[in-house]
Amino acid sequence: NAFAMANGCIRVYSGLMDMMTDNEVEAVIGHEMGHVALGHVKKGMQVALGTNAVRVAAASAGGIVGSLSQSQLGDLGEKLVNSQFSQRQEAEADDYSYDLLRQRGISPAGLATSFEKLAKLEEGRQSSMFDDHPASAERAQHIRDRMSADGIK
């Protein structure tokens, strides 16, 4: 739908605007702004490089540790670390967007409904601990819970 780049540039796919309301697009852009403001792209690159460096160091150690680090088990471990880090960043960017929308006097409902639309597209898909994004239905519920706590319908 959209993504943030390390240089602070945000890209939005035109298809997003066709399927979402203006309020939902505002929420998605706020989410991507969160990634930029919170330094997620750069931190993500650092984590990816760090996990790869650990894996290379383990491989150079040789023996069982070296063999495991070069196996599919090593691939899974690296992917798990990166995906869990990414899921945490997604949740932080969701909260950033929610707070930004509120500060600007814009309804955060578009954030919840954008996730609900994405959840419909994800129906039947099995989620995994290796996913780099939390499930959209869970993200929508988190926003709905925040709205309820803040007295927003």
Question: Whereabouts are the PLM-identified features?
Answer:
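A Zn2+-metalloprotease active-site environment signal
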Residues: 1-153
